[in-house]
């Protein structure tokens, strides 16, 4: 193999189609690694920081695009409900086995060494809620809960004070 043509992949992650989600209640994420040479790559899926194997379908081998370029695709299928949770984080990771430290490489250009290249996406809420707006909603709900709890505590103290005052007044009369 010609070491001068060693090139790491460009990795893209495509989100599931709305039609698939609506019709099948499933969500398929597609990972595409392309433009790499040689074809020494390993592709893995990670969900919420943990590697997953269930629901994964990866091409059996990299396809040759041209003399010095390969591509590889993989799919991860999850339930529509799981995809619609904005807290779920999906990552496609491609480990590219490039040059070793001993391999000769021309000065002035970056040496394509073994490296991990990733693309990622967050789950999308069904009603257009993003992760940031979801977190803002949780924060607002927490603040509202604390205000209501404070009001209830204040009301309990006020009622208790009135009851004690009534008992003292009754005892004195």
UniProtKB/Swiss-Prot annotation:
The chain crosses the membrane at residues 146-167. Keywords: Disulfide bond, Glycoprotein, Immunoglobulin domain, Membrane, Receptor, Transmembrane, Transmembrane helix. CDD domains: IgC1_TCR_beta (cd05769). SUPFAM superfamilies: Immunoglobulin (SSF48726). Residues 1-146 are annotated as: C region. Gene3D superfamilies: Immunoglobulins. Clone B10.A was isolated from a cytotoxic T lymphocyte. This is T-cell receptor beta-1 chain C region. It comes from Mus musculus.
């Amino acid at each position: 193999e010609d070491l001068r043509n060693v090139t790491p992949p460009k990795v893209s992650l495509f989100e599931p189609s709305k039609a698939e989600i609506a019709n099948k209640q499933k969500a398929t994420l597609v990972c595409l690694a392309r433009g790499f040479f040689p074809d020494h790559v390993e592709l893995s899926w990670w969900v919420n920081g943990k590697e997953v194997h269930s629901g994964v379908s990866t091409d059996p081998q990299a396809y040759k695009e041209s003399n010095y370029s390969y591509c590889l695709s993989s799919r991860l299928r999850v339930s529509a409900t799981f995809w619609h949770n904005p807290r779920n984080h999906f990552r496609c990771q491609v480990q590219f086995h490039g040059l070793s430290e001993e391999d000769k490489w021309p000065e002035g250009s970056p040496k394509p060494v073994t490296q991990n290249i990733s693309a990622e996406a967050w789950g999308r809420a069904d009603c257009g809620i993003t992760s940031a707006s979801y977190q803002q909603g949780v924060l607002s709900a927490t603040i509202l809960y604390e205000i209501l709890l404070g009001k209830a505590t204040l009301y309990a103290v006020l009622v208790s004070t009135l009851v004690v005052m009534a008992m003292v007044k009754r005892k004195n009369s």
